[in-house]
């Protein structure tokens, strides 16, 4: 929703999958849920699922919610394996012609796991696109080549993004991206849908910082198509 509004609003079949949508045992309260004012994480996950359904309904979509636990809910237990993700996903979505996954441009363990799984699929011949994941990717704003701003010699967003892509050789050229600029009408509709996440939005928005509510942020969406022919272990410089 935050990252793929243009895609969600496009025609054609599209399966939206929330990979880590499992509900933890009652009586637990994690850090993020505490920040967002929850009193019980199991209750909060159900509230988030309801909000997600409402938001997706605005573009005529629904979601498949897999039972895997979010990183905060499974700690201190282990992360699921790629086999665990594959089994949960194929049981609910048995076939696909293309996969869209987060680029992992921030310290989000779950996004990195899904990206890893998507990279494996790319190596097996399934077309894969990675998307810049808000709000993590805009800690330093958008790169000038995304939003058309003047280059700033003291703000190199490319350098920030590259630190999270060192193990993604399939994404060879950072600026070889598809950038979507939503017009005012679509940007306003996206913001309205994001606000549907009532329990999450104000914290994700950074309060008065207004990170996500800033049209200069939420109107842009960035994607990369992975090159599955890239040698997986080579060392190279991204330009």
Regions found by a protein language model. Give the residues of each.
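Active-site beta-strand->loop->alpha-helix modules in alpha/beta enzyme cores, enriched
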Residues: 1-124, 188
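The feature marks non-catalytic terminal segments
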Residues: 50-66, 75-80, 94, 124-239
């Amino acid at each position: 929703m935050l990252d793929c509004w243009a895609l969600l609003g496009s025609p054609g079949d599209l399966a939206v999958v929330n990979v880590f949508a499992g509900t933890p045992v009652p009586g637990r309260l994690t850090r993020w849920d505490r920040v967002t004012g929850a009193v019980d994480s199991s209750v909060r996950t159900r509230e988030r699922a309801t909000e997600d359904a409402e938001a997706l309904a605005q573009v005529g979509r629904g979601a498949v919610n897999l039972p895997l636990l979010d990183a905060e809910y499974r700690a201190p237990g282990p992360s699921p394996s790629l086999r665990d993700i594959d089994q949960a996903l194929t049981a609910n979505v048995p076939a696909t012609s293309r996969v869209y996954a987060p680029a992992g441009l921030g310290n989000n363990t779950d996004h990195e796991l899904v990206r890893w799984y998507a990279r494996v699929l790319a190596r097996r011949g399934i077309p894969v696109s990675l998307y810049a994941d808000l709000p993590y990717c805009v800690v330093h704003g958008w790169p000038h080549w995304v939003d058309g701003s003047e280059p700033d010699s003291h703000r190199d967003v490319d350098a920030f993004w590259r630190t999270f892509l060192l193990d993604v050789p399939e994404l060879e050229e950072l600026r070889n991206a598809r950038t979507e600029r939503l017009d005012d009408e679509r940007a306003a509709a996206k913001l309205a849908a994001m606000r549907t996440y009532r329990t999450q939005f104000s914290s994700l928005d950074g309060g008065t910082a207004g990170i996500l509510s800033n049209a200069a942020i939420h109107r842009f969406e960035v994607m990369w198509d992975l090159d599955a022919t890239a040698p997986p272990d080579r060392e190279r410089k991204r330009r």
